[in-house]
A protein has these predicted regions:
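C-terminal regulatory/interaction regions
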Residues: 231-298
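Glycine-rich phosphate-binding loop signature in dinucleotide/nucleotide-binding domains
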Residues: 51-54, 135-138, 197-199
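Divalent metal-coordination and catalytic microenvironments
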Residues: 9, 23, 34, 63, ...
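Conserved beta-strand hairpin/beta-sheet module of binuclear metal-dependent hydrolase folds
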Residues: 1-52, 154-165
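Residue-level marker for buried hydrophobic side chains located in beta-strands
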Residues: 31, 60, 83, 161-164, ...
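Metallo-beta-lactamase
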Residues: 37-38, 139-146, 150-226
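A structural signal for the main folded, soluble domain(s) of proteins
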Residues: 19-22, 26-29, 40-43, 50, ...
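Active-site HxH/HxHxD metal-binding segment of metal-dependent hydrolases
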Residues: 37-132
Length: 298
């Protein structure tokens, strides 16, 4: 894992699937924004900290997904790191049963099997309306960016660098993705649009870029959500069940996996888009003996 300078006292660690921002409080103490994936990033993150003589005094979590909170509890135990999280994400992170709220397609048993490493107890809670956080002797800006998850936040370093978590992804990720991860699509679109007024010397996207201009990426991320919703509608034949509809979409998009976690993410994401299409009046749900059937509107 490499350490790359971004701006001022802000750096990023180049983890396996994401960038982990690191803000230097001094030559030794640092604050991390997220911690990577337990299985893939723990040894690399530990080696990076040890080799550079860095002590993780604190971590601020953008949201409770396994590729972001995988090493929070580990850092708390090994280094005495303090962890802060937004109130919704902090609640989700307390144990595998709660963590399932972000992975609802998994059974409780499977959630307990998979997510023991990802769970942690936050040392402090970030309110849902907070715009700043006094932490480890510094003031960090807080951007409330719900949508990707219910309590997703961005963080602004004291030197002005904006970490946007998963609110935006880079163009390479868009080009490779089959279906966006978004819990509440309408809120996600609002959060993405709100970034048009944000000004910073650098912007860090967890997946997986550092940029100085967001304009094109905001447009392409919004277009990606709208494009995928249109493709989903194209796959809907009136009267389909959820199973029929997702099968048709995944067959068209060549989404194939036998990995239960990956499948659960696809199922969850698809279901979130279906809910949005219903909420926006483009799809109607009809129930017969408690079974849902979907119909296009107009």
């Amino acid at each position: 894992m490499n350490l790359r300078h971004v701006y001022g006292k802000t750096y990023v660690a180049e983890a396996t699937t994401a960038l982990i921002p690191i803000y230097k409080l001094n030559d030794r103490d640092v604050v991390l924004f997220d911690t990577g994936y337990a299985k893939l990033d723990r040894s690399g993150l530990t080696n990076l900290l040890e080799e550079n003589g860095l002590h993780p005094r604190g971590v601020i979590c953008s949201h409770a997904h396994f590729d972001h909170t995988g090493n929070v509890h580990y850092l708390q135990l090994r280094y005495g790191t303090l962890a802060d999280a937004q109130i919704i994400e902090a609640g989700i992170s307390v144990n595998p049963d709660a963590y399932r709220a972000n992975y609802v397609a998994l059974t409780y048993g499977k959630s307990r099997e998979i997510f023991l490493e990802e769970c942690f107890i936050a040392d402090a809670i970030i309110p849902a309306d907070a715009d700043h956080l006094d932490f480890c002797g510094e003031c960090f800006g807080i951007l409330q960016l719900p949508g990707h998850s219910a309590g997703h936040i961005g963080i602004v370093t004291p030197d002005g660098v904006a970490y946007l978590g998963d609110c935006l992804i880079d163009q390479g990720q868009i080009d490779a993705a089959k279906l966006p991860t978004s819990m509440f699509i309408e809120r996600d679109l609002e959060s993405k649009r709100s970034l048009r007024t944000l000004r910073a010397p650098a912007y860090i996207l967890a997946h997986k870029a550092v940029v100085t201009d967001l304009s094109a990426l905001i447009d392409s991320n919004i277009a990606f959500l709208l494009q995928k919703s249109a493709e989903m509608l194209d796959c809907l034949t009136d009267g389909m069940t959820f199973a029929d509809w997702i099968y048709t979409f995944c067959r068209r998009e060549q989404v194939r996996t036998k990995n239960e976690l990956k499948f659960s993410v696809v199922e969850r994401n698809f279901d979130n888009f279906v809910d949005w299409l219903v909420d926006t009046g483009r799809v109607e749900v009809r129930r017969e003996f408690c079974a849902k059937h979907y119909y296009r509107v107009g």
